[in-house]
Amino acid sequence: MRRAIEWRRVQTPLRGVLLTGALAAALLLAPSTVRSDPAAPAPVASLTGVVRDDGSKALPGVTVELRLAPGVALTAFTDTAGRYSFVNVPAGGVELAFRVPGFATLVRKNVLLSAGTTTASDATLHLTTSADVVVTGKRTFHNLADLDTPVDDLIGIASASTVGVVTAQQVDERETHRPADVLESVPGFLVSQHSGEGKANQYYLRGFNLDHGTDVATTVAGVPVNMPTHAHGQGYSDSNFLIPELVSGIQYKKGPYYADEGDFSAAGAVNVNYVNALDAPIADLSLGNDGYRRGLFAGSTAFAGGTLLGALELYRNDGPWTSPDDYRKINGVGRWSTGDQANGFSVIAVAYQGVWNSTDQIPQRAVDEGLIGRFDAVDPTDGGRSHRYSLSAQWESTGYNSQTRVEAYVIDYALDLWNDFTCFLRDPVHGDQFAQVDRRVVTGFQASRQWLLTLFGRDVEARAGFQLRNDNIPTLALDDTKARDVLSTVIDDHVSQTSGALYGQASIQVAPKLRAIVGVRGDLYHFDVQSNVPENSGRDTPGIFSPKLSLVFGPFSNTELYLNGGTGFHSNDGRGATLTVDPTTLEPLEKVKPLVRAKGAEVGVRSTNLRGFQTTLAVWLLDLDSELVFSGDAGDTEPSRASRRVGFEWANYWSVNRWLTLDADLAYSRARFTQYDPVGDHIPGAIEGVASAGLSVNDRSGFFGSLRYRYFGPRALIEDNSVRSTASTEVNLRAGYRLTKDLHVTLDVFNLFNQQSSDIDYYYTSRLPGEPLDGVADVHFHPVDKRSFRGSLAYSF
């Protein structure tokens, strides 16, 4: 039976909080029905409605405010069916506000309540970009351009123009040559490779050659991918375990403006979500040239009061190389989940194993002189093997005006990697091949809580949380090798690295057209290094404090303006914090600063003024106290001088009609060292201009496909800018047809015009047999794959 509670109008925020708490306790399982004081003057009216999420599911626990005048409001809560109601309230024009943590606040102005009648006002709330929630369907995010009204996109949700989401549909429409290509759906993000396919990719964003992930933080299904203090390179981010068909959505944010983002996020952070359930079981078989074969089997079913998802991927590919990659991997995902966006629990297990040979970057002079071909290897015994096993759990609970989220994870990780970048420079007899070995167990825990408050008559969404991570690395080794046989051990370290963080953030509606987001973050690290070179053993416990501030103006005609500023950081290899001597020569060395400050600022605009069309523009600046740059001699990244980057990004997405979408992104940056050195101030490998454009077709008659263009601009390869890489372009094609409702075929063509360009270029010294002992400085490149074809047949049961 519906219950009614009589109460007086709320005049102050404190009284509103007290009455809200009392009402929440009384109406836990029933819809809220609010009556005015019996003495309130006529005329009166009633209001009722249902609140749902953008997947049409009822949202319980939503705070519904009926604002009669400034500082005068009635409050109700939705029940388990998402219903709310107000009875016998003053008639006339009112304002309605719907608020719940994890979803964008919806405000409706000038709602007319006619005397003696009941007005219905339903509402749909949309997930905020920070809500990595438990979902039960394929889509975490709708295609934003397809939503009913322009206000239903990121206007009113995002805190910067370079915050965004990528939908599952957008991921599905893209051809993926390798798993990490999914990340190229983020505007301005590029992916390449300088070695074998099983190795972590090269990433580029905001003027950075990020190597394997130095300044972009990546998570998949809530579990971090970046590896600090890694055998091959700081922040190593291997995403070969990613299965594109399971992606439910991607959230991205760029710049150091977000309190919940810590290490490696100075340039940006990308969170890839996985589905909890599939609409139907699928079997997808793919074949292509160069020995490409792939099978994917996935499905979900009801189990033990929840949903059980399972997926298995089998993969093999040789690539266009004279010495075949022979990359073989097996990849499995299992997930059990229960609940919904507001209250849910999920456990996910991921298991990945890969083994491969690799053709590393090769000297340009060796190709020019006819010693080797573009797809030949200097050392055909290079390669690697890796595994990643992870188990994680996520729990989320939403109460009245609050939301709590808890996550825990454990990762068992291993890598054996053999590379030879300098040929015969260090060892003219045996060659310069070296092995990098990494064995670690990663454990982590994080929790956060959000509150909806009213402070001095202003709506406030507050968030606080902490994060804890430990990397126990019993083996962190560097060996000199020949044909993968160990000749000598250079480094054999045991490192325990622990990091903890506390953060807080508040989003305050300062004025009707002004929102302020204030955040602070504190990080504390502990490095414990036990080295085979005793002088390099030791401990260090550094910390860093990072304030953030964003201002959002608008919306004005479905347009918002953003001002963002903040500080962040990236960590350096923990062994640098205790380093005192060179492990080979024992010559004295200076310790490396373990935590490097980043300072950033941004001005941006977002507009959805035209139906179906979204555009964002940002001008940004980012300073680093120390740059991480690639070292050809060491084959990894090393700390260097302080730097500054300035640039702009322009991203556009247009849903032309129900079957055609267009997108185009353009980014440019200028990167320079800010500390003087006579060798020059250009940052080697720093990306300048990038662009991408595409069209996607999804016709009801059964045809679907996409055509995509990518431009990778030239880059300085040496500090004085005397040697530069050439620009490259690539066009990829996808074409498919639905033979039946459950069966479709797809053809992907990569490098459609068979461009002979480089995936990456470096400039450093190497030595081929017969050359001077001090070597030859030269461009070293890894070519883009030749034109290749992949066909797939997919069936949904």
What are the residue ranges of the model-derived segments?
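C-terminal beta-signal and adjacent terminal beta-strands/loops
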Residues: P714-R715, Y737-F797
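Face-selective signature of the C-terminal outer-membrane beta-barrel domain
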Residues: G344-Y352, G384-N532, N609, F613-V619, ...
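Gram-negative outer-membrane beta-barrel transporters
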Residues: S448-L452, P512, A516, Q614-D625, ...
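Short, acidic, small-residue-rich periplasmic hinge/interaction motif at the N-terminus
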Residues: R52-K57, T63-R67, R99-P101, S114-D172, ...
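Membrane-embedded beta-barrel scaffold of Gram-negative outer-membrane proteins
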Residues: Q394-T398, Q403-T422, G554, E560-H570, ...
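Short acidic/polar hinge/loop motifs at secondary-structure boundaries
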Residues: V223-K254, V272-N273, R365, V592, ...
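Transmembrane beta-barrel wall of Gram-negative outer-membrane proteins
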Residues: N289-R316, W321-T359, D382-Q403, W451, ...
